[in-house]
C-alpha cells in the first residue's frame, strides 16, 4: 500500500476500545469505593478509580496522538496534554525504534528527537500511545520523508 492510496494510515492513537475499557474499569472501581464500608479501602479503591478515569480522559484528550500531514512540505503533528505541536521535516533531528526491557521482555518504543522552541526535546511513544507497532509508524514517517536515516 502506498501513501497515495486512501487506505494508508497517517494518524495513530490509543485504541478506543482500550480507552473505553479503562473508563468502564474506573467507573466500576468508583462504584466499589462507594459500596465499601472500610475507610482505608474506600480511599485506595477511590484513588485507583480516579487514576483509571484520568488515564481514559488523557487518552481521549490526546487523540490522535501522532498525525502525518503529507504534501510538498510534510510535517508531523504531535498532540499532547496542552494541545498539538507541529514539527516540519527540518525540526525532526532523529527518529528510531528502541527496545527497552520491561517485565522480562523487550518492548519497542518510538523515539523522536525534535527541536521545539529552540530546545531539543525527546518524545517517546509506545504501543499504547500509537495503537500499533512503533516500527509501522517509523516506516510511514520515512515514506513521507519525515524520519532522517540512521547513520
Language model features with spans:
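Conserved beta-hairpin
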Residues: 53-93
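N-terminal membrane-targeting/pre-transmembrane regions
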Residues: 1-39, 119
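Cytosol-/stroma-facing membrane-proximal "stalk/adaptor" domains immediately downstream
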Residues: 142-151
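Core hydrophobic alpha-helical transmembrane segments of single-pass membrane proteins
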Residues: 26-29, 49-53
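Hydrophobic alpha-helical transmembrane segments
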Residues: 37-50
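Non-transmembrane, membrane-adjacent beta-strand/coil modules in membrane-associated proteins
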Residues: 77-136, 151
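Short, ordered beta-strand-loop transition motifs
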Residues: 2-6, 69-72, 102-104
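Low-complexity, S/T/G/P-rich flexible repeat/linker segments used as non-globular hinges
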Residues: 138-140
Amino acid at each position: 500500500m502506498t501513501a497515495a492510496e486512501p487506505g494508508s494510515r497517517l494518524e495513530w492513537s490509543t485504541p478506543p476500545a482500550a480507552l473505553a475499557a479503562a473508563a468502564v474499569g474506573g467507573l466500576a472501581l468508583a462504584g466499589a469505593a462507594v459500596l465499601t464500608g472500610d475507610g482505608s479501602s474506600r480511599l485506595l479503591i477511590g484513588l485507583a478509580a480516579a487514576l483509571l478515569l484520568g488515564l481514559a480522559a488523557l487518552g481521549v484528550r490526546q487523540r490522535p496522538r501522532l498525525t502525518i500531514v503529507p504534501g510538498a512540505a510534510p510535517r508531523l503533528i504531535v498532540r499532547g496534554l496542552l494541545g498539538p505541536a507541529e514539527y516540519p521535516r527540518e525540526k525532526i533531528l532523529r527518529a528510531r525504534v528502541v527496545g527497552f526491557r520491561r517485565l522480562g521482555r523487550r518492548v519497542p518504543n518510538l523515539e523522536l528527537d525534535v527541536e521545539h522552541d529552540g530546545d531539543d526535546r525527546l518524545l517517546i511513544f509506545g504501543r499504547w500511545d500509537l495503537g500499533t507497532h512503533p516500527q509501522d509508524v517509523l516506516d510511514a514517517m520515512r515514506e513521507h520523508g519525515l524520519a532522517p536515516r540512521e547513520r
